[in-house]
Amino acid sequence: MKATGIVRRIDDLGRIVIPKEIRRTLRIREGDPLEIFTDREVKVILKKYSPIGELGTLAGIYADSLSKTLDCTVCITDTDQVIAAAGNGKKELQEMLLSAELAEVFQERKTVLKKSSDAEFVAITKDRSEYSEEIISVILSEGDIAGGVIFLQKNEKKHFGEMEKKFAAGAADLLGRQLS
């Protein structure tokens, strides 16, 4: 018998404490939704729930359409990782974990346009990649942060403007409404 888990008792209200080390490793924060499953072998399985993950196929199609229309890289994320990516460099972004700096931008709950020369330019993932501009728009569902829509530009001759910023905000709004 292998010992890979941690034993916890259930209290009178049916609650189980998830150890801090596991919460930190899996990036589970207070208030995060968890799905509870059971299997035939009497196992209880907890899975971190991602509302944007439920829209995986739609998010992929939408990201691809936006990327072709705007000629840039498009990422659709939940609060932890890139769910869908399209355009130049999508393979290096797909399913990558998001940076802590991006999570802070999400907390501002607004659409931002940043250039790589700006001091507050944010790396999308922990691996820094070469982009000259970015637009970050937060997906809100029933007032909660569900993820983000991110436009990235590698070509330094092309620049994002108000139109692209409105596209990102509109895309985030549409996806947020799909989740509600």
List where the protein language model places each region.
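Short, small/polar residue-rich loop motifs at catalytic or cofactor-binding pockets
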Residues: A3-T4, K68-D71, Y131-E133
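Intrinsically disordered, low-complexity terminal regulatory regions
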Residues: V7-A85
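Short, positively charged
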Residues: K47-I61, T111-E120, D173-L174
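Juxtadomain coupling helices with adjacent low-complexity linkers
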Residues: G56, G60-S65, L98-A103, G148, ...
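Structured interaction and signal-relay segments at domain junctions
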Residues: D64-K126
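A short, aliphatic-rich beta-strand micro-motif
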Residues: E133-L140
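Glycine-biased flexible loop/turn sites that connect beta-strands or occur in inter-domain linkers
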Residues: G143-D144
